[in-house]
């Protein structure tokens, strides 16, 4: 695990130096992915700004991790910002227009946070560092388009969720964070990732590997999970594919 961690830290460092960027900015939610990414970023020695952004939620784990980072790394400057008032105004305007989908509001929370991250990063000649893992980013597309999917670099997007947990253990991430059920923190009711997806990350990893290898699945329970995985992947491919462009070649 030491070699993997050092490889990612070196990769982040090299990218920042090649593009003459002076800081690393990321959202911290109290989840395993953002905790690992913010710690890997801090280990580069580059100025690191982890931001806790509350909107109708105040995750103590996010605050504890941000404090832990600042205590353990001299190059870390944590930030805590309450976006509730801003989002409340947006919510009122949306409802006035009849655009009151709770799913859309959940995505808008993610996009508002993305705006804040880029405001801070651009103001400090920095990079927005993504926190998505391979299962989310390239398996089922479990992220918000132009929200948490809007980043400059993605250090753990080639790491399975199980690998992220191993990194968290190696990096001594707070045990409460390692033990907490994964959640995107975008819903008022506090629903977990498993509540939304209908499967655990272990199941998703297994299905992702089966799909990539073309494994023939005959057990009914496993077949249902694989079909669920494929359905979600198909629905979200628009996030993973380039934006469709109307081809005008025949007019040239």
Label every model-predicted segment.
Residues 1-28, 32, 36-40, 49, ...:
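Peripheral terminal appendages
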